[in-house]
Curated annotation (Swiss-Prot):
UniProt GO molecular function: acetylcholine receptor activity; acetylcholine-gated monoatomic cation-selective channel activity; transmitter-gated monoatomic ion channel activity involved in regulation of postsynaptic membrane potential
Summary of subunit composition and partner proteins: Pentamer of two alpha chains, and one each of the beta, delta, and gamma (in immature muscle) or epsilon (in mature muscle) chains.
Cellular compartments annotated: Postsynaptic cell membrane; Cell membrane
Transmembrane spans: 241-265, 274-292, 308-329, 477-497
Native species: Bos taurus (Bovine)
CDD domains given in the database record: LGIC_ECD_nAChR_G (cd19029), LGIC_TM_nAChR (cd19064)
GO biological process: acetylcholine receptor signaling pathway; chemical synaptic transmission; membrane depolarization; monoatomic ion transmembrane transport
Protein name: Acetylcholine receptor subunit gamma
UniProt gene name: CHRNG
Signal peptide feature range: 1-22
Amino acid sequence: MCGGQRPLFLLPLLAVCLGAKGRNQEERLLGDLMQGYNPHLRPAEHDSDVVNVSLKLTLTNLISLNEREEALTTNVWIEMQWCDYRLRWDPRDYGGLWVLRVPSTMVWRPDIVLENNVDGVFEVALYCNVLVSPDGCVYWLPPAIFRSSCPVSVTFFPFDWQNCSLIFQSQTYSTNEINLQLSQEDGQTIEWIFIDPEAFTENGEWAIRHRPAKMLLDEAAPAEEAGHQKVVFYLLIQRKPLFYVINIIAPCVLISSVAILIYFLPAKAGGQKCTVAINVLLAQTVFLFLVAKKVPETSQAVPLISKYLTFLLVVTILIVVNAVVVLNVSLRSPHTHSMARGVRKVFLRLLPQLLRMHVRPLAPVAVQDAHPRLQNGSSSGWPITAGEEVALCLPRSELLFRQRQRNGLVRAALEKLEKGPESGQSPEWCGSLKQAAPAIQACVEACNLIARARHQQTHFDSGNKEWFLVGRVLDRVCFLAMLSLFVCGTAGIFLMAHYNRVPALPFPGDPRSYLPSSD
């Protein structure tokens, strides 16, 4: 029984020995490869040899785009491949070892950096191990968080799209020493930024529309000298404007609509109109400051939303001016201003008909007040006679004789009384009339004074009503003008964003889409 259990005790020992043998093979291979190896020398067997370096960029997260600093922050993986003849081995000599993991600081690496960084960080975030195959090819996949410069065009903000790029090049090697190229898979060149759907995190503000990649040669290098190659990865991103529509544009439109509604207040309520309009003006100024903190401080272009807010400010200021002008016109009187015939014709006849406003023609106050009584009968309910109609329609001073004849008749009567009684008149009657003549003349003069005051008051009231009606018509004209300006301006400004679309192809004139066939 004991003899049968010995093989079972030997199995763990055998496994440990085999593992130690495997580790020894990897350690021996690493020692052999690193013997006499200089990581600072370019892996070229001859001076004229060019080392091919393949690049591939995998995007895992588009973190943010800071418009004020014009900086794009991305989380990427940089895949680099090259061949080093000093790292070759025969797998049969090392127990069938096909992959060797080596610290990246122990081998030569191409000094490829992000040229257009904005924070001074040119290198990757983590120097992870490299994978070396028996033929000497090295595979390196370091992660990095880059902050690259991205010129921001704010012309159509927040309905804009931006063209950002990540430019990689060798810091010291020229094209005669290193040949940068895009990686290939299945015989196809990867001319795009690779995105793994399972590892990629969608950005809440930006949507990626195009992600091509291109090889460029430094045009600034002299013709007799070797230039530097650049691998440029482009990101054409479009902003998702829902946040700005809900938090800025919609409140501005609603607040400006309140400024339009002040025209429904009476024409004489100019103080209340100005108060509402100025409050709207202050609210729009706050929104303008919020937008100014978001966009970059540049004078090359004015953001679309800033144009709209400025337009709303102008409309609101015009509304305040209209309210002041209408109030000034409505409070005019015949004592301060005389109405021209053209003004009366345009604002009291033509415009009310065009605007379908019910403006009743003005009539004298006494006659206008008497019409209801003529229609409804006397206060006692009896029918009105012709004499009562005259008494109701005319002033009391006109019942005796007309205004222009009154003074002449009184003067003629006094002259006859002074000459003496005529035939058929008794001296007593003439004497009593002569004694009462001064009182009658005083009564007539009092009636004349009352008639003149009544006429002046009627003229004054009629003039006030005319100016008030002119103010009403002017207020209605300003309302229609401001409403048309507000609607047309809002539609015109935001229709400009409709034509600002991301191009269907990343490069004008190039029919290629720079995307894998599956996309």
